Amino acid sequence: MTNKTREALKAEFIENRGYWSSFWEDVLELDETFFSAYSKFSSIPSKNNALSPKIREFIYIAIDASTTHLYLPGLKLHMENALALGATRNEIMEVLELTSVLGIHTCTLGVPILMEELRDLGRGDEIDNIEFGEYEKGLKNTFIKNRGYWSPFWDDMLKLSPEFFECYLDFSSVPWISGTLEPKVKEFIYIAIDTATTHLHKEGARIHIRNALKLG
């Protein structure tokens, strides 16, 4: 391709994606055909405009900052983009707070396996027969109030370790209590980190897609 064609591809990318970086300069130089195909592919959300440019940058931040990815160059770039689009430091911090709960999936994976193994050994009653007292009922009600949903998984978590559940509840509720992003956008962040190719957490994605749809 000619330099003129490359400049046209670069201009098209900037128009659709709203930024440019030295990384894309290298890709364009190495393989214009691949760059052109990727540019068209990655620009579809921007052209559809279902989400505002700032919200799209928040989603990029969440994916790059998630514990399954931790991609520093992308994180820095998309924070810069979000700030340029008018994002506040509190909004970006809220995105990071929402993203940080991804670590709980250690338990969402492990706890159901633990329960299955206990039941297979005939020991399921050790947990199944636990009845919630006022303390546990209060935690459950607070979770539903703060987070807007409940899942059967949380019943087992709450029975296994009410103290741990309470700490997670306090931790995960911070952006829901003091944050400024609308609830629907919070759910978009959860959807993004659950469906990222480095995670692909089906059950979490289902819960948060359902929540987002209920929120409009």
Indicate residue ranges for each PLM-predicted region:
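Acidic, glycine/proline-rich low-complexity segments that act as flexible tails and inter-domain linkers
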Residues: 1-55, 84, 107-185, 214
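Short acidic alpha-helix initiation/capping motifs at coil-to-helix transition points
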Residues: 33-39, 68-75, 163-169, 199-205
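Generic structural signal for hydrophobic core residues of well-folded globular domains
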Residues: 45, 62-66, 99-103, 118, ...
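Amphipathic alpha-helical hairpins
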Residues: 48-59, 74-92, 180-188, 204-215
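Amphipathic alpha-helical interaction segments
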Residues: 49, 66-70, 86-89, 102-106, ...
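Amphipathic, charged-and-aliphatic alpha-helical interface segments
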Residues: 56-71, 186-201
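Hydrophobic, ordered structural segments
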Residues: 93-115
